[in-house]
Amino acid sequence: MPAKKRTRKTVKKTVSFSDDTTLTTHQNREKKNVDHDRPPVYVRKTPLMTFPYHLVALLYYYVFVSSNFNTVKLLSFLIPTQVAYLVLQFNKCTVYGNKIIKINYSLTIICLGVTFLLSFPTMLLTILFGAPLMDLLWETWLLSLHFAFLAYPAVYSVFNCDFKVGLWKKYFIFIVVGGWISCVVIPLDWDRDWQNWPIPIVVGGYLGALVGYTIGAYI
């Protein structure tokens, strides 16, 4: 009988370099340190808590109560109510790492000044999008102030969360998109007072902010 051939098992050879192992371990430690130093930031999915009830009241006042759509007076109501919304609602839903950040009252005041300054680049962008420059410059700046202070809670959160801009930019986008969509009613030949610049854009910005702060946590 022919002798059976023995099959030899192939042994996989592995080579380990201590320098590579040390480098991998060091990179893993660095990643853990980065995660510890820059914990994740998110807004809790609590629409009843993040819903900006005050914007509904302000819109109702502006459209149905105020005389001649007083944009200046509306702004004087917007600023304090946005601060109250940040302190009482929005900040309590913002989680940094594993904890809710306590409100920084000095930072709220600083961010009021920052938001005011943001109205100037906002005005420039509004003009680039086609806003009137010479004839209605005051109205255009008022619109920019409204847009800037509608984003005030997001501006504060950028400063209070180590400048994590990516999370908060969606709130700016909602405001801009709301104002941009509302432009369609201006050229219509209806001859209504509410078609005058910048009334429709103000209303659109408020509606955009209303939607953004309500569903922003889900996006």
Curated annotation (Swiss-Prot):
It is found in: Endoplasmic reticulum membrane. Pfam families: PIG-F. GO terms for biological process: GPI anchor biosynthetic process. GO terms for molecular function: mannose-ethanolamine phosphotransferase activity. Pathway: Glycolipid biosynthesis; glycosylphosphatidylinositol-anchor biosynthesis. Its main location: endoplasmic reticulum. Keywords: Endoplasmic reticulum, GPI-anchor biosynthesis, Membrane, Phosphoprotein, Transmembrane, Transmembrane helix. The modification Phosphoserine is found at residue 16. The chain crosses the membrane at residues 46-66, 68-88, 109-129, 136-156, 171-191, 199-217. It is a multi-pass membrane protein. Residues 67, 130-135, 192-198 are lumenal. The keyword Heme does not apply. One of its GO terms (cellular component) is endoplasmic reticulum. Acts in the GPI biosynthetic pathway between GlcNAc-PI synthesis and GPI transfer to protein. Required for the formation of complete GPI precursors CP1 and CP2. Belongs to the PIGF family. This is Glycosylphosphatidylinositol anchor biosynthesis protein 11.
